[in-house]
């Protein structure tokens, strides 16, 4: 890719992070999605988990509706910790855009040693959540729920 295009893309990403009224979309969603596919082969993370319970997807509030939703709440909390982590001070270290390296082998995830401290922290947030998802039942009745009613 042309370096000028990369700079424009980076500028757009940084400006999105600075927009206080618009929550940033996780730009490393592909990595997290692939981690989930590693622990749950055949799953469709972007479809199945983007609007599940009170915490899976954008935002989150109230009491989690089940074990899977608690996995998402824990993941949200981990990202909040990452934003405050001393090694994650740069806007480029946001958990929503930070790229890290990991391996998937036989359903087992490993965050690689070549990650910097911030990347390792965020990788472990995603790894822990993917493992949690794999151990939690998926209840279809908790997909696309009325969050105003169920997430108080």
UniProtKB/Swiss-Prot annotation:
Keywords: Calcium, Disulfide bond, Hydrolase, Lipid degradation, Lipid metabolism, Metal-binding, Secreted, Signal
Location of this chain's protein in the cell: Secreted
Protein known as: Phospholipase A2 GL16-1
GO molecular-function terms, A-Z: calcium ion binding; calcium-dependent phospholipase A2 activity; phospholipid binding; signaling receptor binding
Residues making up the signal peptide according to the UniProt record: 1-21
Family: Belongs to the phospholipase A2 family. Group I subfamily.
Record-linked PROSITE patterns: PA2_ASP, PA2_HIS
Keyword match Membrane: no
EC id: 3.1.1.4
Known catalytic reactions: a 1,2-diacyl-sn-glycero-3-phosphocholine + H2O = a 1-acyl-sn-glycero-3-phosphocholine + a fatty acid + H(+)
Residues engaged in binding Ca(2+): 55, 57, 59, 76
Active site: 75, 126
Disulfide topology: 38-104, 54-151, 56-72, 71-132, 78-125, 88-118, 111-123
Keyword set includes DNA repair: no
Upper taxonomic lineage: Eukaryota, Metazoa, Chordata, Craniata, Vertebrata
Residue positions assigned to the propeptide: 22-27
Purpose of the protein: PA2 catalyzes the calcium-dependent hydrolysis of the 2-acyl groups in 3-sn-phosphoglycerides.
GO-annotated cellular components: extracellular region
One Pfam family named in its UniProt record: Phospholip_A2_1
GO process annotations (BP): arachidonate secretion; fatty acid biosynthetic process; lipid catabolic process; phospholipid metabolic process; positive regulation of fibroblast proliferation
Note on cofactor: Binds 1 Ca(2+) ion per subunit.
InterPro entries per UniProt: PLipase_A2, PLipase_A2_Asp_AS, PLipase_A2_dom, PLipase_A2_dom_sf, PLipase_A2_His_AS
Cofactor section: Ca(2+)
